[in-house]
């Protein structure tokens, strides 16, 4: 039993938050003791664990199937909470997304059901500014993207002049999310754009103009 808090500020995967883990109502640790899923860096927990076992040093919890099951249950509780917000309290979900979109992307990348539920609201950088995926998807069934930042920097101006919308998928999870969503939605097509390919197409257009 316990309480999970969504932190009101942005956190990083490399930074460990302070928690309170009790074992049979006695303070065991201010670490999460591996109770939280690896992606839940935006969560702080206050938990009392009666059915789990402590290590001999009484500084952490024994890593066994009981701990694994508890971690899975906590992960499901977090996902259920976010799912409920999307369905019933969009304003609150948007507030959490504004602060923790990177972590929400991490959740969606490992859970197809939540990917379908969250994807339209997730922000992606494009050559026309940051847009929700729903906005990108509604513009065209063909989604153009680049895999690395250098390619994106080179193609964004040319693509903009041609009226193309290009997603910068260089950030962690972005390309994975695009590919997984496309596999789940075959009506969508992903088109990886590179500077060389864009210049070739631009050259072909210019050659046709000269020929005419």
What are these regions (language model features)?
Residues 1-212:
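Conserved GHKL (Bergerat-fold) ATPase module
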């Amino acid at each position: 039993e316990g309480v999970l808090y969504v932190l009101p500020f942005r956190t990083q995967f490399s930074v460990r938050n302070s928690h309170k883990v009790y074992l049979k109502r006695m303070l065991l640790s201010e670490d999460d003791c591996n109770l939280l899923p690896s992606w839940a860096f935006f969560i702080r927990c206050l938990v009392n664990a009666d059915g789990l076992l402590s290590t001999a040093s009484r500084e952490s919890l024994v890593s066994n199937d009981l701990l694994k099951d508890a971690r899975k249950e906590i992960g499901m509780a977090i996902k259920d909470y976010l799912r409920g917000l999307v369905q019933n309290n969009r304003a609150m979900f948007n507030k959490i997304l504004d602060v923790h979109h990177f972590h929400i992307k991490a959740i969606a990348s490992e859970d197809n059901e939540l990917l379908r539920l969250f994807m339209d609201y997730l922000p992606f950088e494009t050559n026309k500014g940051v847009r929700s995926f729903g906005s990108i998807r509604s513009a065209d069934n063909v989604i153009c993207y680049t895999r690395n930042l250098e390619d994106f920097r080179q193609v964004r101006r040319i693509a903009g002049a041609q009226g193309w919308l290009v997603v910068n998928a260089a950030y962690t999870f972005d390309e994975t999310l695009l590919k997984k969503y496309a596999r789940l939605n075959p009506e969508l097509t992903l088109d990886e754009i590179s500077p060389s390919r864009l210049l070739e197409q631009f050259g072909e257009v210019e050659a046709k103009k000269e020929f005419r």
